[in-house]
From Swiss-Prot:
SUPFAM superfamilies: Class I glutamine amidotransferase-like. It comes from Rhodopseudomonas palustris (strain ATCC BAA-98 / CGA009). This is Phosphoribosylformylglycinamidine synthase subunit PurQ. It comes from the Bacteria. It is found in: Cytoplasm. Residues 3-233 form the Glutamine amidotransferase type-1 domain. It catalyses: N(2)-formyl-N(1)-(5-phospho-beta-D-ribosyl)glycinamide + L-glutamine + ATP + H2O = 2-formamido-N(1)-(5-O-phospho-beta-D-ribosyl)acetamidine + L-glutamate + ADP + phosphate + H(+); L-glutamine + H2O = L-glutamate + NH4(+). InterPro entries: Class_I_gatase-like, PRibForGlyAmidine_synth_PurQ. One of its GO terms (molecular function) is glutaminase activity. Keywords: ATP-binding, Cytoplasm, Glutamine amidotransferase, Hydrolase, Ligase, Nucleotide-binding, Purine biosynthesis. Its EC number is 6.3.5.3, 3.5.1.2. The gene is purQ. CDD domains: GATase1_FGAR_AT (cd01740). Pathway: Purine metabolism; IMP biosynthesis via de novo pathway; 5-amino-1-(5-phospho-D-ribosyl)imidazole from N(2)-formyl-N(1)-(5-phospho-D-ribosyl)glycinamide: step 1/2. One of its GO terms (cellular component) is cytoplasm.
Length: 233
């Protein structure tokens, strides 16, 4: 698996992401500066990590979405390449037009930093094949604007097409208002593009890949990607 991790001013999770990718794949990720106009040759996974790109000015991800490197990412995605956006990366993908909807202020207007539970809605995608369908995993969140919103038709289309891959839930897998940490429409924590090759999610799976962290539930996402790409090679 040859990964490229994008780096924007204000991003602060790129090293965490690169470490997770190496732990699972055994390969170093290329760190790609936002001013680059091309991705490294042979890249088969692009990751847009979390943080506060450009200080979250204008809107979260709005400035980063217009960086030169994002033209290369859009082309990469159009050609079928796998793209993963986490937290601020999810916001950037939405602002870039690679995913529908927008991430708004959390419903209670407070920054949330804690572990949450997610239900894996399906496991027949590159981003979920490391889990079982319906499996509940625990991963951290750290965001102030993670409230996913889209118009009613878009949400219905996402649901109908099976494009909601991760959903906030209880430890037992129950979905409801009391388990929806940020007010996201339909308890959405992660969605995939129409072609299924671009995933955006607010939680941070890269922070739960090592035993020392007390939980390795995030490892399945990266292991599934590595398995998928190994088969495709």
């Amino acid at each position: 698996m040859k990964s490229a991790v994008l780096v924007f001013p204000g991003i602060n999770r790129e090293r965490d992401m690169a470490r997770a990718l190496k732990l699972v794949s055994g390969n170093d990720a290329a760190m790609v500066w936002h001013a680059e106009t091309e991705l490294p040759k042979g890249t088969d996974l692009v990751v847009v990590p979390g943080g506060f790109s450009y200080g979250d000015y204008l809107r979260c991800g709005a400035i980063a979405a217009r960086a030169p490197v994002m033209d290369a990412v859009r082309k990469f995605a159009a050609d079928g390449g796998l793209v993963l956006g986490v937290c601020n990366g999810f916001q950037i993908l939405c602002e870039s037009g690679l995913l529908p909807g927008v991430l708004m202020r959390n419903a209670r207007l407070k920054f949330i930093c804690r572990d949450v539970h997610l239900r894996v809605e399906r496991n027949d995608t590159p981003f979920t094949q490391g889990y079982k369908a319906g499996q509940v995993i625990k991963v951290p969140v750290a965001h102030g604007e993670g409230n996913y919103e889209a118009d009613e038709d878009t949400v219905k289309r996402l649901e109908g097409d099976g494009r909601v891959l991760y959903r906030y839930c209880s430890p037992e897998g129950e979905v409801g208002e009391s388990h929806n940490i940020n007010g996201a429409a339909a308890s959405i924590a992660g969605i995939v593009s129409e072609r299924g090759n671009v995933l955006g999610m607010m939680p941070h799976p890269e922070n739960h890949v090592e035993d020392i962290m007390g939980c390795t539930d995030g490892r399945g996402l990266f292991a599934g990607l590595a398995q998928h790409l190994a088969k495709a090679a």
